[in-house]
Amino acid sequence: MKSSPGLHIIIVGAGITGLATATSLRRAGHTVHLYEKSAQDNEIGAAIYVPPNVSQFLLPWGLDLDKWGFVKSQKVSFLHHASLETKMTLSDGMTAKGLTGAELYYAHRVDLHGCLRWMATRPEGPGRPATIHLMSNVVAYDPLAPSITLASGEVISADVVIGADGVRSDAVEAIIGDKVQTMRPRFANTCYRFLVPADAIEADPATQFWNEGSDGWSRVMIESVTGRSVVSYPCRSNTIHNFVLINNEENDTNMCAEDWHARFKIPDILKKFSDYDPRLLKVLSKAPDARRWPLIYRKPIHQWTKGCMTLAGDACHAMLPFLAQGGAQGIEDAVALGVVLQGATTRDDIQKRLQIYQEVRMKRASIIQILSNMGADHSVSVEDLKEYLNEDQMPYSQHDMMIHNYKYDVAEVAFEAMKRYDPSFRLGNDFLGR
């Protein structure tokens, strides 16, 4: 006997959030179609943190750490920018594992994307494989139908529409009636990404030192006067070193254009960090290319849901990278959606459950959004947090911040919210996979 197909759900955007949401919803028993405007034939990106607040779901969902090249965080050190001398190494009690009991991993963004795509579409496993429609540009939304309109003019209806279309979201306008204003930080407004092969480093005796003991080692080098920083950690089974260079650039008129495809001359970038240890600059020079990510943020929005349509990921809470929680918060959205929509039936029921999703997710995502943005714009302050937290709840120290971000189970929070809505609510045995 065939199981019920559940709801017909459309997800717009097949990035990390969209694919994680598709995985969560297929496990909840629904039929999922993703519409992605690109061909996804040349995925790009640098590395990404996969912290405990989401690795706790990805592992039981089938994440094979070795297959996808994830690297377990082993050590975090702060080095002097001009000498590379170690100033401080976090003790075991201050690591993600020590504080939460769960691991933090480093992954190449392409590998995480590939893993989530496999989870969402694999023939075996709980639920029905999600279907991805590439080169399908969505040009209009109707949250009340709900439906989407493709560039071809085709209108596609569903029980639920989820806008996971990223930082340049059009879906958000359908929810709140206007575009979300983008803002440039007052400080640290530019991020350069380098991916340096470990083999290239090893081939030069002058740079081999960077490979020594580098398994799972994250290194942070901050120049305190200007706030420039360099962060490095390995990914793809320790075969690639990911470097993030943060700088403030006041005279660039094109800073609001977020373009991962734009390439920049490495010597020109390194001149901006010329006071850093020459050995580090030599390591960076081994990168085949470098990409710039203009750091642009948005303030929290106060509505994610309208009718039978909602938002997830950067579409509703784009944030700066200083807490390395952007991707993780999108995955938390995905898990919450899988929980609240499990067993949904009628239109009225769906709308109420999407409101529960908003209540579960909006406060937490907004807090992390503000905390992330505080790292680069001093006009974003504690005052912004007071809308969401009392004074005694605010995470001021690094310890408190890590506990707040990492030691959190969104599935449990969403489950408790659903139990208040419907005391008979149950999660299917396959959903968490634990």
Swiss-Prot record:
EC number in record = 1.-.-.-
* Catalytic machinery residues: 193, 233
Pfam families given in the database record? FAD_binding_3, NAD_binding_8
Record-linked InterPro entries:
FAD-bd (IPR002938), FAD-dep_Monooxygenase_BioMet (IPR050493), FAD/NAD-bd_sf (IPR036188)
**A Gene Ontology biological process term:** flavonoid biosynthetic process
Sorted UniProt keywords: FAD, Flavonoid biosynthesis, Flavoprotein, Monooxygenase, Oxidoreductase, Signal
Q: Which Gene3D superfamilies match?
A: FAD/NAD(P)-binding domain (3.50.50.60)
Positions binding FAD in this chain are 36, 314, 327
Cofactor dependence: FAD
The answer to whether the entry has keyword Flavoprotein is: yes
GO molecular function list:
FAD binding; monooxygenase activity
Pathway(s) it belongs to: Secondary metabolite biosynthesis; flavonoid biosynthesis
Determine the domain of life of the protein's source.
Eukaryota
- Stretch forming the signal peptide: 1-22
Any idea what a deletion of this gene does?
Impairs the hydroxylation of the flavonoid skeleton at position C8.
Role, per record? Monooxygenase; part of the gene cluster that mediates the biosynthesis of chlorflavonin, a fungal flavonoid with acetolactate synthase inhibitory activity. Within the pathway, cfoG is responsible for the hydroxylation of the flavonoid skeleton at position C8. The pathway begins with the PKS-NRPS hybrid synthetase cfoA that uses benzoic acid or p-hydroxybenzoic acid as a starter unit with four rounds of chain elongation using malonyl-CoA to form the chalcone skeleton.
Concerning its family, UniProt says: Belongs to the paxM FAD-dependent monooxygenase family.
Q: How does it assemble?
A: Monomer.
Query: Which PANTHER family does the annotation name?
Result: FAD-BINDING DOMAIN-CONTAINING PROTEIN-RELATED, MONOOXYGENASE
Q: What name does UniProt use for this protein?
A: FAD-dependent monooxygenase cfoG
Origin species, per record, is: Aspergillus candidus
What gene does the UniProt entry assign to this protein? cfoG
